[in-house]
Amino acid sequence: NRGGGLLDPKNHFILDLRQPLLDKGNVDVLSEINVEAGWECTTCQACTEVCPVGNQVEKSDEIRRLEVLVEGKVPQEYQKLFMNLQESGNTEGRTDSPLADRLPTFSPDKEYVLWLGCFARYELDPNFTKSVENFANILDVAGITYGVLENEHCSGDPANRLGDKLTYNMLREHNMEQLAHASKVVTLCPHCALNLEKEYAKYSEVNYDVSHHTQVIAQLIEEGRIEVKKGSNGKVTYHDPCNLSRMLDEVDAPRTAINATTDEFFELEESGRNTLCCGAGGGLWWKKETTGRTHLVRAEQVVNSEADTVVTGCNFCYGMMNQGLKPLTPEGRSEIQVKDVADLVSE
């Protein structure tokens, strides 16, 4: 609710249920909580991270699952999203991908599946396409073989977080078949990485290893397989993606890569596992603006930090930073550059 939204996790998901449970012993969850506020949860797990008694407050997707599967209630903004996922296997209802067409196709003799995800595959932020190509170039320079799947579907993250478990399992089963001959998967999307590695494993055995692209880049730097030069990006800071830092517990690899490219790196006010959510998780990227979003709070922190460049390791964070910084950058000040870790290293 730092962005001005309705959601207050402690009150809406814990205290609103405590007294009715004490009074009645058994309650109808949907009648006792503010369901509208539940749809604003980004599932970033910040509330769980700081909860002193370890309540898993972030499990709002369970509340949304009740709304979707039991009540059949889906906010209008998500109805088209669910239809696209069910009919086309991706969030945008697309069948074409110019980016995928330009990249090598995966075959079992290649080391990595380069998993694009819907954001990159269908260019939800066209600027991010260059980040994917920069990472592919890094792999080429290091002599690593890779390819994209011809029939990659959405990892299912939006359906999973928004409560549509039937659609999620349909996507999961399809992707598991597509990955049957893969031993290693690398992706620029922490949301996809989380699902491909940890969420899928809740349903069936996963026979491939999943890496985030910053982990691969950091390893290549440490092994001396790529030469990285200091760039001219001015003062550089890093926005930790929630899925990467909290859910995948990766905060070191991006910094290893960034520090190889600059001597002017500094931390933001909230960083590491204590990062501030960009506001796009939990399917909210596809939700129309209602009240506020935390990406404006985060963008203001970046502006006030006097950074020249803000780096991130997530496609959604990349898009939200671009959206948030433009209206908040003071007139007369140079535009703050938003870059992926791969962009810095590729330069």
Per-segment meaning from a language model:
Residues R121-H212, N243-E347:
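Cofactor-cradling patches in redox/metallo enzymes
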Residues Y238:
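Hydrophobic alpha-helical positions that pack around
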Residues D8-Y200, L220:
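Iron-sulfur-cluster electron-transfer modules
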Residues A218-K235:
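Acyltransferase donor/substrate-recognition loop-hinge adjacent to the catalytic core
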Residues D109-K110, Y208, N233:
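Sequence-level motif detector for i,i+2 pairs with an aromatic at +2
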Residues N1-L7:
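Non-transmembrane accessory domains of multi-pass membrane transporters/channels
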